[in-house]
């Protein structure tokens, strides 16, 4: 899935190696144990923000594994991630729609429940994450702004 706009891609393609490059991120367990690739979608949004020089909203949090097709996949430990976001002062959390069953349990015990100061939104794909997180110029949607291949 290539989401980089043509003008930015042209700048990046001025590198050698037949104008081909890719980004591969490996997050080994190391000193801090991790339970799966929960940061995949957040890392993808951060890289796109950096490469395209589009700022992100700093009042949001995001979790979800990202597939090679740009789908946001379910993760473990959603309850602690939502609780952590709320405790950190986050206003809006995005999480995989495939974790909807987990979110229903969380919504039963969130105190106070979701309101203008805190909400959780389920997402299916990277475009929904980009639409929520990035301050995309010209009031365009991610689908309009980013080049699809």
Residue ranges and their predicted role:
Residues 1-149:
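Peripheral, non-AAA+ core regions of ATP-driven protein-machinery
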């Amino acid at each position: 899935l290539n989401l980089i706009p043509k003008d930015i891609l042209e700048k990046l393609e001025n590198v050698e190696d037949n104008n081909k490059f890719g980004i591969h991120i490996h997050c080994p367990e190391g000193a801090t144990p991790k339970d799966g690739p929960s940061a995949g979608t957040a890392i993808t949004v951060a890289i796109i923000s950096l490469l395209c020089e589009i700022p992100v909203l700093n009042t949001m949090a995001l979790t979800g594994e990202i597939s090679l097709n740009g789908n946001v996949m379910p993760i473990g430990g959603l309850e602690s991630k939502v609780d952590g976001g709320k405790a950190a002062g986050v206003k809006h959390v995005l999480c995989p729609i495939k974790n909807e069953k987990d979110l229903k349990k969380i919504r039963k015990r969130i105190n106070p429940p979701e309101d203008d100061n805190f909400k959780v939104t389920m997402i299916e794909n990277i475009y929904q994450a980009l639409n929520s997180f990035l301050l995309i110029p010209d009031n365009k949607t991610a689908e309009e702004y980013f080049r699809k291949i």
